Amino acid sequence: MFPIPWSPLGWTFPKGGNVHAVGKTYEGGVPLAEVVRSGFVEGVHRGSVVALDATGAAVAKAGDVTSPIFPRSSNKPLQTVGMIRAGLRLADSADLALVSASHEGEDFHRARVGGLLARAGLDESALHCPPDLPADEEARAAVLRAGGGPTRIQMNCSGKHTGMLLTCQAAGWPGEGYWRSEHPLQERLRAAVEEFTDEPVAAVGIDGCGAPVLAVSLSGLALAYLRLVQAEPGSPERAVADSMRAHPEIVGGTRADDSRMMRAVPGLLAKVGVEGVIAAAVPGVGAIALKIDDGAGRARMPVLVSALRRLGVTAPALAVFAEVPLLGGGRPVGAIRSLW
């Protein structure tokens, strides 16, 4: 029995609920990646993907790329643009990259978040994101060995939440309730997402960090990333793209997929979102957005590599990401690879 009213056209929530959605829902995708062990296909990951050329025209697509999804953290660069437009000013481009980050909680991430808060006269108690351990396995193990536990700064969205608080200070808005969808900050961020995706937000939910998450289509998400990398130098959107590409390790981490991909492919902007989402763009080439339906992050990179190759990106370093090894007895016995 559904605890919330439902209709074939989408979820509808009563006033005061956590989400409001109107319009069609995501229909699901097609087989995009296969899991091959010892020569035997033991699984398939379905999903949707769209590749746009440098003009914004779709040159390849599969699955449902026009219905709304929650891009999750792939929306962060667009939200950062909204923060800059609302008054956020950060002299260090690495700090700007941190606002767009889903950082893995390594030492340098935690130090940078703490420094931003301290310079603003704040501490982590001002953050609405929940306490967490670092996402990076080595960083998490080090924290636990030292007797530490979950903190808000370690949570992977703490950079975004810090940016939101600093934006409120700059704009003269109250910090209280900055995460609520009706706060003037969130209204500005929603406007930025709608502008760059060229479509209205179809649903507003609550992300894992407690801030609003905005639903748009994969086509809209890809268009937004294309606009980020092809924006005029000096514009807020170009500043966001440039900061992320200049500091890829800040965006994710030493071992994060999007960080590794940006280090490997010149000019590439990439940002993952949980539930199997990633968006990427290369100036003068095009942009990609994809979602793996079952949320498996392991299938993202092989499909992204396939999409980049369809756009003519031939960087030799792509080969490292084209297949994800499967182990048996501690040695490779198969791989996850793209079907698209």
Protein language model annotation of sequence segments:
Residues 19-66:
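Beta-lactamase-like hydrolase cores
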Residues 19-26, 94-201, 227:
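Active-site-adjacent helix/loop patches that line small-molecule binding or acyl-intermediate pockets
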Residues 41-46, 75, 272-274:
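Short, flexible loop/turn motifs enriched in small residues
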Residues 71-88, 108:
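Active-site SXXK
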